[in-house]
Amino acid sequence: MTVATKPEPDKAAVLAKAVLNAAGQLGLTQADLAGVIGVHRTAISRMKQAGTLDPASKSGELALLLVRMARALFTLTGGDADWIRHFMRTPNNQTGGVPAQQIQTIQGLMTVLRFVDAIRGKV
């Protein structure tokens, strides 16, 4: 008797799909996403077609942080897409700016992520 084993999912494919879903959930355009992960916006189109993003690359590491932020916001809001988009597009006194603009830099991404993690810790 042979046992069928499930092949291990391709980490690069999983990350590409996750970051594209996270960007959609956060209301980010392709250009916004490109700015966050540090690539040209045409690279996002190529990533969609190829379906891969190397988790070990700098872009991959930034994508993982963005996915973490999106998941935390999803948990906080119970999946309320309107609230998530409102949070991303309006000035926030606690983060010191508009989160969608702040996450265009690594420092801003970390600031917003720390804020969301801190709020999530209180819930």
Where are these regions (language model features)?
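Non-transmembrane "mature" sequence context
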Residues: 1-123
